[in-house]
């Protein structure tokens, strides 16, 4: 019998579209994982639309759901995956749950996308309350095993600015020293060796060699920029990175190549479809730019490698 691998995913939920748990659950299931989803919010659609309605789960309600799992003794997990959170007490409760689950299963891997803000034209801006930063820095990152910040979030967590690839590697080492063995800076403002049409991402993974010493693999990836604003890409990235690092635990290069290549196929299919719907010369709407997830099932399951990672 095939070994079951179960993920507890605590993220947002939308009725229409693909962000948060809606962007993470399908690819993880396609790749063979059982996914138990806790919806931190339930909205009609993502907040990039003109209107949205819905409810927000608070920390007491999260505790209640977790207590229900505990009472039935079904709170055994191999992975925890978290993304966007707006509330400090909710985030602290997530940390408590992760710590309890790790006591039960010391091999549990916590994958955290520390969603706090982004960089536009060199200027960084937070889109969560400022009081979340110390919680991420002091409580969340120390219990995380894999983190997927963008450049701005990596700078926030370490208090260091990144202007060069060398500085990015130093920041990733600082993040390692805070706890996680795998760090992927999912996007950066750094100029790619391939030119300004490319977006650069960087990764670093520490593994223990048979002799007990720590070995670090560092990689760089360059992805062709797409001129559109997608929502849910970070959630999809973190979910697929979880899956591919599980399948290639000591090879970040291969895990990232599969993750980024699958992302490429999903985004290309999405932009092609959005442009066909919007018509020539018309900017696609948020609804038209929803990720073409179901249509990309084969690419998620078995991505043709179109992005090669460079080992640094």
From Swiss-Prot:
Q: Which gene encodes it?
A: PDXK
What modulates its activity?
Activity is increased in the presence of K(+)or Na(+).
Task: Identify the keywords attached in UniProt to this record, alphabetized.
Answer: Acetylation, ATP-binding, Cytoplasm, Kinase, Magnesium, Metal-binding, Nucleotide-binding, Phosphoprotein, Sodium, Transferase, Zinc
- In its UniProt entry, what is this protein called? Pyridoxal kinase
Active-site residues, record numbering mapped to chain: 235
InterPro entries, sorted: PM/HMP-P_kinase-1, PyrdxlKinase, Ribokinase-like
The opening ranks of the lineage are: Eukaryota, Metazoa, Chordata, Craniata, Vertebrata
- Which positions bind Na(+)? 113, 148, 186
Q: Does the keyword Magnesium apply?
A: yes
* Molecular-function GO term, any one: ATP binding
């Amino acid at each position: 019998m095939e070994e079951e691998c179960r993920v507890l995913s605590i993220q947002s939920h939308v009725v229409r579209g693909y962000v948060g748990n809606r962007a993470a659950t399908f690819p993880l299931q396609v790749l063979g994982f059982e996914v138990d989803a806790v919806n931190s919010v339930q909205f009609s659609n993502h907040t990039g639309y003109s209107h949205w309605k819905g409810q927000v789960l608070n920390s007491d309600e999260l505790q209640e759901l977790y207590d229900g799992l505990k009472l039935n003794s079904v709170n055994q997990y191999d992975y925890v995956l978290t993304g966007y959170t707006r509330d400090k007490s909710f985030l602290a409760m997530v940390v408590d749950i992760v710590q309890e689950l790790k006591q039960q299963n010391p091999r549990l891997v916590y994958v955290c996308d520390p969603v706090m803000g982004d960089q536009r034209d060199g200027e960084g801006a937070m889109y969560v309350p400022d009081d979340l930063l110390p919680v991420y820095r002091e409580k969340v990152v120390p219990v995380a095993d894999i983190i997927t910040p963008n450049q701005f979030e990596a700078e926030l967590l370490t208090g260091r600015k990144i202007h060069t690839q060398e500085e990015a590697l130093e920041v990733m080492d600082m993040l390692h020293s805070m706890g996680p063995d795998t760090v992927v800076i999912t996007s950066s403002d750094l100029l790619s060796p391939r030119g300004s049409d490319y977006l650069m991402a960087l990764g670093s993974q520490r593994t223990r060699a048979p002799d007990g010493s720590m070995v670090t693999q560092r990689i760089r990836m360059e992805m062709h920029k797409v001129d559109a604003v997608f929502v849910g890409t970070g959630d999809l990235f973190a979910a697929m990175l979880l899956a591919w690092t599980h399948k290639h635990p000591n090879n970040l290069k291969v895990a990232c190549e599969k993750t980024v290549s699958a992302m490429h196929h999903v985004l290309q299919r999405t932009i092609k479809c959005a442009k066909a719907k919007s018509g020539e010369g018309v900017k696609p709407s948020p609804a038209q730019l929803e990720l073409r997830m179901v249509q990309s099932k084969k690419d998620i399951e078995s991505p043709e490698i179109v992005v090669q990672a460079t080992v640094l």
